[in-house]
Amino acid sequence: MREYQSISSLQTFVDCPRCYWLHYIAGLDGESSPAQVLGSEVHEAIRDYHTHGTHSNELSEVGGKLYKVYVENVPQSILDEPEREFLVPLVNIVTGEKLPLPFKGIFDGISTKTGWIHEHKTASNYWKLEDINDNIQATGYAYAYFILFGKLPRGIRFNILKKNKITCKYQSLETWRTYEDLIYFFNWAKRIFEEIETSDFAPKQTRFNSHHKMCPYAGN
């Protein structure tokens, strides 16, 4: 039985219940994609930058370019808590209803002085405001911030690092969440909890064809 849920686990179930079962119940870890490997590499370097002023890990060519673009645009002192982990109860902030498992995640960075959450993303294309205004991760992390600090975050800033073989670009987008959004997040999570309880974990084709290697849809 799982001890917690996360944005990744809940979203995986929404995308493909079979992939959820394989990864989160059977414990069969899938292989990381090249994009995931690059993202982890850059996130680690950014964490070290905000903690120590420089990075300690060896970077790939593209990873080095993305890191360079980041430090040229984001001050080292802007975050006082890079990669802060959290584990919070999933509670309806109005009714007090509580879900059986807590919510776990990691803020890429927060500033306790300004109240901003920072999320770092590597991407092949520029993002649009719609991408972050409807982003369930941002809503979930705003909820976690509220539970931890007793107030809404001032905002969520996405530091987007656009990659290509020649040049890498930096894009900053900002979004906000309301108390109504926090209730929406609880209800979203509750619905998925209920669906998991009765699911037969049948496979489902995902939008971007991203599947666990043992899913019948893998490679299709």
Language model features by range: what are they?
Residues 26, 47-51, 122, 146-150, ...:
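Hydrophobic/aromatic-lined pockets within catalytic cores
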Residues 87-138, 146:
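Non-catalytic protein-protein interaction segments used by genome-maintenance enzymes to assemble
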Residues 24, 119-122, 160:
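Residue-level recognition of conserved beta-strand positions in structured domain cores
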Residues 35, 127, 131-135, 175, ...:
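Flexible, glycine- and charge-enriched loops at secondary-structure boundaries
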Residues 29, 126-127, 164-166:
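Flexible loop/turn segments at secondary-structure boundaries
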Residues 1-112:
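Metal-dependent nuclease catalytic cores that hydrolyze phosphodiester bonds in DNA/RNA
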Residues 4-5, 99, 144-220:
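Metal-dependent nuclease catalytic regions and adjoining charged, substrate-binding loops involved
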